[in-house]
C-alpha cells in the first residue's frame, strides 16, 4: 500500500469564487471528515494530488492540517468533465489499524479455455482491509477455465487480513462461448449465386 505525503493548508474562504481562485492558484479544494470530527476545509497542491490519485486507494498523509499528521483516504473525487482536472476531493480520516471498506481492482491472469471469452461482470471487488494494508489489486487466475464457468466473489483469493465486503455469491466474471462470426454480404451473395 502506498502512502503519499502532501502539504495541506486550511481554507478560510468558501463558496464558488473562493474555489475558483484556489484552482487558478494550482490548489484543489478538499473536505476532511470522519471519526466524529467536524468537517474541515483545506486546499491541496493540485499536481501532487493528481499524481497521488493515479494509485487506486492511495493513503494520503496530510501535513500542516493539525499539530500532527492526518492519514486520509480519498472517498469522492470530482473532475472537470471536459478538461479532466481535479475540482474537489472528499477525504476520509483513518487511523492505523482501522478497517475500511474499499473497492480493489481485479487483475486477470491467464487465458480461458479454447473457444471461450472472458466476460468481466465487475472490474473491482469491495473488500474490508486495514487502512494501511489495502491491496493494490486482487489476482484472479482464469487459466484454462472452460466455457460456462462463473467466478464469484467468494472464489476470490484474498490476501491475508483482507475480508470480502460484498455478497460472496455475486458473479464477478464468467467464461462464455465465442460469438460465431457473421457472414458478410459478399459471402451471402456468393452462396446465393451457387
From Swiss-Prot:
Highest taxon in the source lineage: Bacteria
Name the SUPFAM superfamilies for this protein.
Ribosomal protein L25-like
SUBUNIT field: Part of the 50S ribosomal subunit; part of the 5S rRNA/L5/L18/L25 subcomplex. Contacts the 5S rRNA. Binds to the 5S rRNA independently of L5 and L18.
A Pfam family this protein belongs to? Ribosomal_L25p
Q: Which UniProt keywords apply?
A: Ribonucleoprotein, Ribosomal protein, RNA-binding, rRNA-binding
Name of the protein in question: Large ribosomal subunit protein bL25
Q: Which GO terms describe its biological process?
A: translation
Signal sequence segment: none
Q: Name one GO cellular component term.
A: cytosolic large ribosomal subunit
Gene that specifies this protein: rplY
Q: Which InterPro entries match?
A: Rbsml_bL25/Gln-tRNA_synth_N, Ribosomal_bL25/Gln-tRNA_synth, Ribosomal_bL25_b-dom, Ribosomal_bL25_C, Ribosomal_bL25_long, Ribosomal_L25_dom, Ribosomal_uL5_bac-type
Free-text function comment from the UniProt entry: This is one of the proteins that binds to the 5S RNA in the ribosome where it forms part of the central protuberance.
From what organism does this protein derive?
Thermobifida fusca (strain YX)
Q: Name one GO molecular function term.
A: 5S rRNA binding
For this chain, the family text in UniProt reads: Belongs to the bacterial ribosomal protein bL25 family. CTC subfamily.
Amino acid at each position: 500500500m502506498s502512502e503519499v505525503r502532501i502539504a495541506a493548508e486550511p481554507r478560510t474562504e468558501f463558496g464558488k469564487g473562493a474555489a475558483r481562485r484556489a484552482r487558478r492558484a494550482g490548489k484543489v479544494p478538499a473536505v476532511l471528515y470522519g471519526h466524529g470530527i467536524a468537517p474541515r476545509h483545506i486546499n491541496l497542491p493540485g499536481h501532487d494530488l493528481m499524481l497521488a490519485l493515479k494509485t487506486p486507494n492511495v493513503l494520503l498523509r496530510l501535513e500542516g492540517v493539525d499539530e500532527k499528521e492526518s492519514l486520509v483516504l480519498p472517498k469522492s473525487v470530482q473532475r472537470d468533465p471536459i478538461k479532466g482536472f481535479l475540482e474537489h476531493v472528499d477525504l476520509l480520516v483513518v487511523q492505523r489499524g482501522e478497517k475500511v471498506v474499499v473497492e480493489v481492482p481485479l487483475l486477470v491472469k491467464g487465458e480461458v479455455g479454447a473457444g471461450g471469452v472472458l466476460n468481466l461482470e465487475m472490474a473491482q471487488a469491495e473488500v474490508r482491509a486495514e487502512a494501511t494494508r489495502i491491496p493494490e489489486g486482487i489476482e484472479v487466475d482464469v487459466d484454462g477455465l472452460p466455457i460456462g464457468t462463473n467466478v464469484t466473489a467468494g472464489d476470490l483469493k484474498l490476501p491475508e487480513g483482507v475480508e470480502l465486503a460484498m455478497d460472496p455469491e455475486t458473479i464477478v466474471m464468467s467464461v462464455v462461448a465465442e460469438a460465431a462470426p457473421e457472414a458478410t454480404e459478399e459471402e451471402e451473395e456468393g452462396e446465393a449465386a451457387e
